[in-house]
Amino acid sequence: MSITVEEKARLIKEYATKEGDTGSPEVQVAILSSRIATLTEHFKSHKKDNHSRRGLLMMVAQRRKLLDYLKKKEEARYTALIARLGLRR
């Protein structure tokens, strides 16, 4: 249900703003989006897995907070990120 180390490293490299950047909102949102997509696929076959569903809801809330923060600080970066990730906002 989680993403692999290689997938996480690829996301960090793709969305990092500078070398060694793992904590920027862009990287965090990209990793959360990947984990959310993985869990969404999991729920297609495990409809009654409510413990994981709670984790999914917490991840969605965390992503929402990070996106709101980014929109408040720099709206240009926010719009570029949601366009790259294909999020509907």
Curated annotation (Swiss-Prot):
GO cellular component terms given for this protein: cytosolic small ribosomal subunit
InterPro entries the UniProt entry points to: Ribosomal_uS15, Ribosomal_uS15_bac-type, uS15_NS1_RNA-bd_sf
Ranges annotated as spanning the membrane: none
MF annotations from Gene Ontology: rRNA binding; structural constituent of ribosome
Keywords tagged on the record: Ribonucleoprotein, Ribosomal protein, RNA-binding, rRNA-binding
GO biological process: translation
Bridged cysteine pairs (disulfide): none
Biological role stated in the UniProt entry: One of the primary rRNA binding proteins, it binds directly to 16S rRNA where it helps nucleate assembly of the platform of the 30S subunit by binding and bridging several RNA helices of the 16S rRNA.
HAMAP family: Ribosomal_uS15_B (MF_01343_B)
Subunit composition and interactions: Part of the 30S ribosomal subunit. Forms a bridge to the 50S subunit in the 70S ribosome, contacting the 23S rRNA.
Family: Belongs to the universal ribosomal protein uS15 family.
Protein name stated in the entry: Small ribosomal subunit protein uS15
Organism for this UniProt entry: Cereibacter sphaeroides (strain ATCC 17025 / ATH 2.4.3) (Rhodobacter sphaeroides)
Upper taxonomic lineage: Bacteria, Pseudomonadati, Pseudomonadota, Alphaproteobacteria, Rhodobacterales
Gene: rpsO
